[in-house]
């Protein structure tokens, strides 16, 4: 089953500000979510219906809508700051 990936504009903006090498790494991680939205390294965020995927010092925060097979990337950022904006 393939999930559709939606990246919210704020997450896309954050991604575009990162170094090119990190952008490619994060884009690769996001792409893998289409075939497996809950890889073993994913953690559910406490008190929210969102998950986080670690990529080096950066985090991808996303939610899964299983009923419509969609993964929505909410935010992308450095581990120190990504949780503050949600």
Where are these regions (language model features)?
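A short, surface-exposed loop/turn module that caps and links secondary-structure elements
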Residues: 29-54
